[in-house]
Amino acid sequence: MEAPDYEVLSVREQLFHERIRECIISTLLFATLYILCHIFLTRFKKPAEFTTVDDEDATVNKIALELCTFTLAIALGAVLLLPFSIISNEVLLSLPRNYYIQWLNGSLIHGLWNLVFLFSNLSLIFLMPFAYFFTESEGFAGSRRGVLGRVYETVVMLMLLTLLVLGMVWVASAILDNNKASRESLYDFWEYYLPYLYSCISFLGVLLLLVCTPLGLARMFSVTGKLLVKPRLLEDLEEQLYCSAFEEAAPTRRICNPTSCWLPLDMELLHRQVLALQTQRVLLEKRRKASAWQRNLGYPLAMLCLLVLTGLSVLIVAIHILELLIDEAAMPRGMQDASLGQVSFSRLGSFGAVIQVALIFYLMVSSVVGFYSSPLFRSLRPRWHDTAMTQIIGNCVCLLVLSSALPVFSRTLGLTRFDLLGDFGRFNWLGNFYIVFLYNAAFAGLTTLCLVKTFTAAVRAELIRAFGLDRLPLPVSGFPPRASRKTQHQ
């Protein structure tokens, strides 16, 4: 064999090994996410649905749970996609010739983007509708009962739904797109209609993020306040615990010995009072066990961090609005070749990349908080060991829509300059200046409005509680104080 043949063979072997390595890394990453999501979903599922007398229903619920786990793993992968790409680029810039990070390259990142796009389409269009119809199916009339009969009914329903959605997408593309070829190429499902459908879903997800994120940014302050110990400057914890124990003992004694009172007792009301007093006592004990640093510095530092992150995100969006008016390069666009390790995507280098990653995670958490805080989706909020299977399916679909729109959301707002890879950059509406500009302006305006309305009221209330002014007998506006009433009677 000649020398050129050896060179060709070595190149082919290298490409083969790189491909196998990328497959192994992708499989390990997905397996890790799948295990984490399975553990997470088992904490919220309703155990009665999986331990029923009917083995058929339990089998159906187990299959639906595995499909939900797969979808949630893809959603978590979509959340980690953009931060992982930004960090990988900075690592390759810092250590360009390190032997131990040769597996980290542009081909791997580009492949992960394509896999997330593919499996997001698969989950939204096929797996989640299949899981819902599968749990609701009972088999065709006259057919034998069993899992196979349910599968037949589910497949038929899914085919009808696919035809309906495909027809709607074809009509929408024919109306919105003036290209005659798009109306005649109905057979071109994979190259045109599936990305077009996902583009519409992603656009709805970006609009949902526009509504939920400002609401979540405002709610993050109150949610953090419930998780941390708030400082109280003028309080005696021992006295409050002593009083709380006496208040709890009175209704408890009435419940244990109802015959001691000659008046009829409302036992349900007494139980609610005991539960409320026990909750109050647990909070007081938590405050007593907390250290002085945790009581006095933890909550203010957390509020300061939230305020800095929120203000920084609004500032970046405002700067991006000005860049849109000046430079056309600020528009979000797709990138076909993932050339990583050549230039930093932040003006501040690695420090700026860390800030970008922190802002992306912060906005994603805020959007989830805002989503479950909104009145429209509050009923979807999962409960510990008490979440129905259909509710789990709905949560997985909503989280996948939000997470798959996160890369487009972050690039549209200018939080990062990392261009969208693969099919994420093929969305037609990303090239519309008016949509991108109005989206940035709406986000900045809604976030500022929610912060001004919510944060100022929350700070005022917390300052009043911190100084103990809420326990003072202050007069209510519109009514004279008690002393003046006594003087009037005299």
From Swiss-Prot:
One of its GO terms (cellular component) is plasma membrane. Residues 1-76 are annotated as: LCN1-binding. Pfam families: LMBR1 (PF04791). It is a multi-pass membrane protein. Keywords: Cell membrane, Endocytosis, Endoplasmic reticulum, Membrane, Receptor, Transmembrane, Transmembrane helix, Wnt signaling pathway. InterPro entries: LIMR, LMBR1-like_membr_prot. It is found in: Cell membrane; Endoplasmic reticulum membrane. Residues 1-59 are annotated as: Interaction with LGB. GO terms for biological process: hematopoietic stem cell differentiation; negative regulation of canonical Wnt signaling pathway; receptor-mediated endocytosis; T cell apoptotic process; T cell differentiation; T cell proliferation; Wnt signaling pathway. Plays an essential role in lymphocyte development by negatively regulating the canonical Wnt signaling pathway. In association with UBAC2 and E3 ubiquitin-protein ligase AMFR, promotes the ubiquitin-mediated degradation of CTNNB1 and Wnt receptors FZD6 and LRP6. LMBR1L stabilizes the beta-catenin destruction complex that is required for regulating CTNNB1 levels. Acts as a LCN1 receptor and can mediate its endocytosis. PANTHER family: LIPOCALIN-1 INTERACTING MEMBRANE RECEPTOR LIMR, PROTEIN LMBR1L. Belongs to the LIMR family. This is Protein LMBR1L. It comes from Pongo abelii (Sumatran orangutan).
